[in-house]
Amino acid sequence: MNKSELKPAVVFEQFAKINQIPRPSKREEKMIEYLKSWGESHGLDTKVDETGNVIIRKPATQGMENRKTVILQSHMDMVCDKLVDYEIDFDNDPIKTYVDGEWLTAEGTTLGADDGIGCAMELALLASDDIEHGPIECVFTRDEETGLTGAEGMKAGFMTGDFLINLDSEDEGEIFVSCAGGRNTTAKFTFRRTEVPAGYFFMRAQLKGLVGGHSGDDINKQRANAIKLLGRFLFAEMTKYEGVRLAQFNSGKLHNAIPRDGMFVIAVPHDLKENIKADWNIFASDVEDEFHVTDTQMVWTMESTDAQPVIEDQVARNFVYALQAVDNGIYAICQDPELNGMVETSSNIASIVTSDNEINIVSSQRSNVMSNLDNMCATIRATFLLAGAVAESGDGYPAWKMRSNSQLQKIVKESYVRLFGKEPVMRGIHAGLECGLFSERYPNLDMVSFGPTLRFVHTPDERLHIPTVQMVWDHLLDVLKNIPTV
């Protein structure tokens, strides 16, 4: 198969044009101008809001004028990543694609099918003159990937439809009907550094090789968290031996990832050195046994290191006590039977950075129920406040709660069964989607999310499964035919 043979041709033609346009997150100006010019050149009602979101409205086809209005929504930006030795200027150069069996992928870069393929479906529908549909609003949001900026900045009234279909999902056959809201809770311990008496020995411990993963979508896998493990060891040693002093603790890099590695530096009386090493080895063996399924490549090291001032003892102990006490992982499971045991509420301690006089901690909380998100954040904040830290939770983003009487879910499900002879998986996701922000501003909007199969998104290995594009296109058109009257 070559690119000229890709089906549906109308969608892949639009996707090829989109991939000529640079559209890195936060630098989507060329894409905004392209969409604006495209809509106007096709004689369609086209508007750009102050955030940079674009909406293109198309009237109903003949005989469909009394159907409810459907919003189709995708994000226009893409994650720009490349192989180390591949030359590209993402602000000016096109994405070069090729067919690899049943997959479309890119030469040395991310493909941009997340969410360029959703945008392509919208443009193909807008350009058509032979597809039955009621009134439609095609919405293209900006900067989804690095902050949900477009959805966050969209004001009520920009969209006016009754139903919304988000085209940003990555597994054909799965229909998303709910997503988690999320917030970051940060904590800060302030301290003075002191010198240790003569006779102390400094040791640097490191843990690496954990699997990690996304702190929302992967939290149900119950993988090891480097911060919690290192904190657990320190708690055991500092409550067992009076003389252990903490100098450094660093772990994690991203607010939305399970930390894969970490390190600490401690000072111990010389006569405790061998005891600490023995405890470290026993602890490593125990933890490897606990996580023998999820994390099989752990690497534990402990070695001598240079002397340095330590954190004042009471602050260090309060910090370690808080690490031991703070909730981490799954907190509650969804009660809706349709969501099939999905995680509802969770917390992940994500990163810790120690500087000369501060320890800064970032954690993330998620829930599909906003009151439980409030409670989870309060629990994390209270843990650190009790330990003497300054702690606060940010504004975050709202949940999209499953709608039990959804007309759109029923239409989408029945259409899928009619076309493919099997039921789709109706599910939620324990991560944030733009639908969460839409649900806050448009509380009566009935929404679903679906899309073709993508793999290795956000990496140069990103690939789009070609046969599923036709399936999603057929499904989308059948849904539009069956939208009810006003």
What is the role of each PLM region?
Residues N2-E102:
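Acidic/His- and Gly-rich active-site-bordering loop/insert found
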Residues K7-V11, E344-N357, F420-D478:
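Zn-dependent metallopeptidase/amidohydrolase metal-coordination segment
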Residues K36, G157, R223-K240, H270-K273, ...:
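His/Asp/Glu-rich mid-to-C-terminal helical/loop segments that flank catalytic regions of hydrolases
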Residues M64-T146, A151-D162, N184, F202, ...:
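Active-site metal-coordination/substrate-binding segment of hydrolases
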Residues M76-M78, V139-G147, S169-E172, V211, ...:
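Acidic, glycine-rich active-site loops and adjacent beta-strand->loop/helix elements
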Residues E102-T105, E145-T146, E152, A156-R366:
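Midchain, well-structured core segments that form catalytic/ion-binding scaffolds
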Residues N225-I227, R232-F249, M402-L445:
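Active-site-adjacent substrate-binding region
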Residues M342-A431:
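Substrate-recognition/cap regions that form aromatic- and gly/pro-loop-enriched pockets
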